[in-house]
């Protein structure tokens, strides 16, 4: 069994309302990191997590213990005890719904002390409302919530995911404007993590890739940036 230094270990709680895709997300990560060859599949029945379960995965030399938590509040004590051992949290939302009770409880439990990331699942559904869900999250919780990616659609059909730090010239006018506005929000949050970056940003200078990465890392660690990523766990 491989032994890891303590500074190379991370406990990550996976939180969210029941049915949002927490377990499927862990299965997708396990498949991507080659822990398993089982491809995540959508079940005909709703799978419920009753107890915390741990899935260890390795990435870039780090060992991540992914802690799957119950989405129903009959098991709230299980979630609280899991959070006490967590270094960070991933809050999973369903793109076809609005903020749910489990989402609210997840934000309540993580508070401001635990670094967090939001994963919006099921963006390939025709019922997905990603943009509206982002606006709802920012209005209800914090303008520190900012997308790192936006889904691209043709009509109601999902086509791709765009990294907002990438060039937008290949996007349609509608999505180019959305990407540029989102990038502006992120860049301001990045600049606010460091006085030197803030001075550089407001003087109109471009931040380097290294400065952007440093700002994102510091911002997440301090709770000044809550990044949003998106995807579909069953499409991996």
Show where each model-derived region lies.
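P-loop NTPase catalytic nucleotide-binding module
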Residues: 1-20, 94-235
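Alpha-helix boundary/interfacial micro-motifs
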Residues: 34-35, 39, 87, 111, ...
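P-loop NTPase switch module centered on the Walker A-proximal segment
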Residues: 1-85, 89-92, 99, 147, ...
């Amino acid at each position: 069994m491989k032994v890891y230094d303590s500074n190379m270990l991370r406990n990550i709680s996976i939180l969210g309302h029941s049915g949002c895709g927490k377990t499927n997300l862990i299965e997708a990560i396990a498949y991507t990191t080659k822990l398993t060859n089982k491809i995540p599949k959508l079940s005909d029945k709703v799978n419920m997590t009753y107890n915390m379960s741990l899935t260890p995965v390795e990435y870039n030399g780090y060992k991540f213990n992914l802690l799957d938590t119950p989405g129903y509040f009959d098991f709230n004590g299980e979630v609280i005890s899991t959070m006490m051992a967590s270094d960070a949290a991933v809050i999973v939302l369903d793109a076809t719904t609005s903020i749910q009770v489990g989402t609210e409880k997840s934000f309540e439990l993580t508070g401001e002390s635990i670094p967090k990331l939001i994963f919006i699942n099921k963006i390939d559904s025709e019922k997905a409302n990603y943009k509206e869900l982002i606006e709802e999250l920012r209005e209800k919780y914090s303008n520190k919530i900012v997308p790192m990616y936006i889904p691209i659609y043709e009509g109601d059909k999902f086509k791709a995911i765009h990294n907002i730090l990438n060039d937008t010239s290949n996007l349609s006018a509608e999505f180019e404007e959305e990407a540029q506005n989102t990038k502006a929000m992120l860049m301001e949050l990045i600049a606010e993590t460091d006085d030197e970056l803030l001075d550089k940003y407001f003087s109109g200078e471009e931040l380097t890739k290294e400065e952007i990465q440093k700002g994102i890392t510091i911002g997440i660690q301090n709770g000044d940036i809550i990044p949003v990523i998106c995807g579909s766990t069953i499409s991996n």
